């Protein structure tokens, strides 16, 4: 992430088991999310859309990336809690529901940012 951010003079946002955000000067790791998210088509697209939405609200793309991936990860965790005995279709819909219901307190309580 640091190399990409430095080479292209941008903020790099990389998703995975641990999400990484870097602007070449700062680095953050997000430990939210659930493995089930990798089994559903569209979670990457959702993450991109949410990142764009947060980017539109600030000049600090590093903070926008942190906010976006933390929100998406928490939504995935909540969705899994609600649908762990159901299929991936229910899980995908629950992610959408969870992201639309997130509030500041939930993000502050559940966010795992290093």
Regions found by a protein language model. Give the residues of each.
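N-terminal loops that bind phosphate or other acidic moieties
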Residues: 19-33, 58, 82-86, 113-114
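Conserved post-catalytic alpha-helical subdomain immediately downstream of the catalytic base
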Residues: 52-90
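Charged C-terminal helix
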Residues: 74-114
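Buried hydrophobic packing segments
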Residues: 48-55, 65-68, 95, 99, ...
